[in-house]
Amino acid sequence: MPDGRASTRDYMKHTGAVGVLALDEQGRVLLVRQYRHPVRHRLWEMPAGLLDVPGENPLHAAQRELWEEAHHKAGDWRVLIDVYPTSGGSDEAIRVFLARDLAEADGEKFAAEGEELDMEVRRFPLDDVVRAALAGDLHNGALVAGAMALKAALADGALDTLRPADAPWPARPF
């Protein structure tokens, strides 16, 4: 413990994850809808995935997830936010990237399997995503946090001052 006393605590170890809030020129974000068995619902989320490829840095993982889940690529990448979504029970850390200058990816689409088989991909105006989050219609924590952060960065004119995509990440050094 911070004061030097010993304590026993159970928590889940987690590899960490990345998410991609992909923003197009019309102010829309690219989201995916997929079934999530632990909550038994289809949820709207940003393209995201685990840091489960040995040696892969977070930016490359984010680029891979954007391609696999939405068959898109981006020319401009920034760090939007870093979060611990369940810090009371897990060491999970998520880095959410902002991706801009979007284009459809070249080549064949990724061969989806499992929960990703019937994934739906759509673009929504960011303002609609924020309203849906505030109305209780969006439940993915990383998406809600990322959308609110993006809305704030846009309001402040701060997109170009966001951290570079390769910024240090103390929670998951790479």
Predicted regions and their residues:
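Acidic, metal-coordinating catalytic segment for phosphate/diphosphate chemistry
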Residues: M1-L21, E25-Q26
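Unchanged
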Residues: V18-G19, L50-H139, D160-F174
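Beta-strand scaffold of nucleotide-dependent catalytic cores
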Residues: L30-Q34
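Short connector loops/turns at beta-strand edges and beta->alpha or beta->beta junctions
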Residues: Y35-P38, L102-A103
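A conserved beta-turn-beta hairpin within the catalytic core of GNAT-like acetyltransferases
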Residues: P38-W44
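Short helix-capping/linker segments at secondary-structure and domain boundaries
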Residues: L150-P164
